[in-house]
From Swiss-Prot:
This is Exodeoxyribonuclease 7 large subunit. Its EC number is 3.1.11.6. The gene is xseA. Bidirectionally degrades single-stranded DNA into large acid-insoluble oligonucleotides, which are then degraded further into small acid-soluble oligonucleotides. The keyword Nuclease applies. Its main location: cytoplasm. GO terms for biological process: DNA catabolic process. One of its GO terms (cellular component) is cytoplasm.
Length: 448
């Protein structure tokens, strides 16, 4: 046994089944009115009954306004209704859309019988319905030349799609000749083969006035058409068999014209929107370009070109001066560095030696002068000068030797060397070298 369901869920399920039943969406019900009451809102509530059953019915004010008689209790009527359920009470009731006094019941019976037959034959199936063309070039109209339907359709087409051509087939839309003329016009439109979509219809009326569009000859012509057909018969509450067989049903002739040009109108609006956007974009670009040109025209440079050239020359002269000053400053710095490097060799110690030797020479010269003859003194002086020259740093350098200085101090042996750069003094200049390895004696090697 399935799980129990709440009452509201059962009611919703039953209502959904009723609403989904195509036959119950619009059915003509014959019965006698009882308990009729019209409220101030305009809505009418009553019961339809026969000898065996009764059903609650409601007719809303928008439909009640179309009544051509005043309903009363005991009156026998035919009510075109939708069968549904009122969820609050769970009552199955009729939503009456159209109601007429009985007397034309045979027409409704024929209508309902033929409707069931066509539905069983599949003539109402959505699968067989043809789609409307997106951009029709020619629209065919089958209607009366005297009614308002033609004016409404043509006016709407010209307003929404003025480039679309119209082919009009004038026919009678009620009376004995209406059905054969409408069917013949539909076939003629198909023989032309230049129409992209057909609108078949007329304005509203009674069931007798609309009956031509329930006749088999018209229904069969619509079914056989290779051109998509929009049925626009009567008002929104009027339904004919032509409406069910046609590819699309329109509530009014004006609505039919709108459906025929729906995509055209949408594309037109898109084009207008894009055109406005493009216009705004172009105007914005033009305004920006105009402003830029005006700024250039009003700039001081264009108004006074001599002043602009003078400014350029002044900036060039300043750049030239800065370049010359920079070169001089660089040359001064280089000269100073060169002097510092040339003075890095430590000659103070040799200067002291030379001074001491000079004093000794002078002393010896004085002694020789006093104690020896001049020739012997001269010889000794020459010998001393030779010895002095032998120990002179310049003499050492002239024989191919060099002096090494590191961090401003004279290097006398390998162990004094440290990692980094050293200055090597030659007879004719100096060089900078990097100490990478120390070798003490013949065997000991020290990596820096």
């Amino acid at each position: 046994m399935a799980n129990p369901l709440p009452v509201s869920e059962v009611v919703r399920y039953v209502k959904r089944q009723l609403d989904d039943d195509v036959l119950l969406r619009q059915v003509a019900v014959i019965g006698e009115i009882s308990n009729f009451k019209r409220y101030s809102s305009g809505h009418c509530y009553f019961t339809l009954k026969d000898d065996a059953s009764r059903m609650k019915a409601v007719m809303f004010s928008r439909d009640a306004k179309q009544l051509q008689f005043e309903p009363k209790d005991g009156m026998k009527v035919i009510a075109v209704s939708k069968v549904t359920m009122y969820e609050a009470t769970g009552d199955v009731q009729l939503y009456v859309e159209l109601m007429r006094q009985d007397g034309i019941g045979l027409l409704f019976e024929r209508y309902e019988a033929r409707k069931r037959e066509l539905e069983e034959m599949g003539w109402f199936d959505d699968e067989r319905k043809k789609p409307l063309p997106m951009f029709p070039e020619r629209v065919g109209i089958v209607t009366s030349p005297k009614g308002a339907a033609l004016h409404d359709i043509a006016t709407t087409l010209r307003r929404r799609a003025p480039h679309v051509a119209i082919t009009f087939a004038p026919v009678a839309v009620q009376g004995e000749m209406a059905a054969p003329q409408v069917a013949s016009a539909i076939r003629w439109m198909n023989e032309r083969t230049d129409c992209d979509v057909l609108i078949v219809g007329r304005g509203g009326g009674s069931i007798e006035e609309l009956w031509a569009f329930n006749e088999d000859v018209v229904v069969e012509a619509i079914y056989a058409s290779t051109i998509p057909i929009i049925s626009a018969v009567g008002h929104e509450t009027d339904f004919t068999l032509s409406d069910f067989v046609a590819d699309v049903r329109a509530a009014t002739p004006t609505a039919a014209a709108e459906l025929a040009t729906a995509m055209i109108d949408a594309q037109r609006k898109d084009v207008e929107r894009l055109d406005n956007h493009l216009h705004k974009a172009v105007r914005s670009q033009l305004d920006e370009s105009r402003s830029r040109v005006e700024r250039m025209i009003n700039s001081y440079g264009l108004k006074s070109p001599r002043y602009t050239i003078s400014q350029k020359r002044e900036r060039f002269a300043q750049s030239e001066i800065r370049l010359e000053q920079g070169m001089r400053r660089h040359l001064t710095q280089a000269t100073h560095q060169l002097r510092q490097l040339s003075q890095q060799l430590d000659v103070k110690r040799f200067s002291k030696t030379l001074s001491k030797q000079g004093d000794e020479v002078n002393h010896m010269v004085e002694r020789l002068r006093r104690t020896r003859p001049l020739e012997q003194a001269t010889l000794q002086f020459a010998q001393q000068v030779g010895r002095l020259h032998a120990v002179s740093p310049l003499a050492v350098l002239s024989r191919g030797y060099t002096f090494i200085e590191q961090d401003g101090a004279y290097v006398q042996n390998v162990k004094q060397l440290r990692d980094g750069d050293v200055s090597i003094r030659f007879r004719d200049g100096h060089a900078i070298a990097e100490v990478k390895e120390r070798i003490v004696g013949d065997e000991e090697r020290t990596d820096i």
